[in-house]
Amino acid sequence: MPGADDAYRQSRERLRAAEIDLRERIEVVAALRRSLPHGPVVPDFRFIERGDPVRLSELFEGNKAELVVYHLMYWADDDEFCPMCSLWIDGFNGVAAHITQRVNFVIASRAPYDKLHAWGASRGWDRLRLLSDDGPAFARAIDAEDGDGRPDATIVVFKKDDDEVRHFYTAHPILEDRERGIDLLSPVWHLFDLTPSGRGDWYGTNEGFDAFTRTAKASPIHHRAF
């Protein structure tokens, strides 16, 4: 940028080197993940979709042998779902058409299907497959729920091996430490990280979301030439 002094240029060069190193380290971690050995064979868990049962094995479509499941946190009898989970899924919805070109992808939750579907409709999740767990077995198997029914956000990957489905990878967010954990799955924090103030104490909320989506739908898209 014109006008930058030497101190800025030197600091920016150090940052550039660190950014390159970070990208390389991310790939090292991704390679370690890809090289995980075969996980255990899992039961053919049952879910509910539009009132009908569907099995885990039936979620593998076409020739795609990999399935990614995001498990949305829900507290029994609560009117709303986890705002952070909903934030992640807002982003997934926008790129679902791209994700499903390569892997199978669904959203699951312990919530009753009608409540889950209504929540998805209120958020504009029109590109995602939503499933309700049929009982606690699946959530507890992936550590998305403990024995007392306390939920935890979870993303889990399965791989179909002939007629068997195997567990491949599971991860949970770490929201107590500046939202690190599965934040790589959302652009929100990365945009904050580009700013001088960083992430600060920001925390996702469901408040105001309906008004925002109504405004966005009502406003035309303006294209600006640069």
Spans of model-derived segments:
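Thiol-based oxidoreductase modules, predominantly thioredoxin-like and allied folds used
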Residues: 47, 96-115, 126-137
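Non-globular targeting/processing and membrane-anchoring segments
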Residues: 1-97, 101, 121-122, 136-226
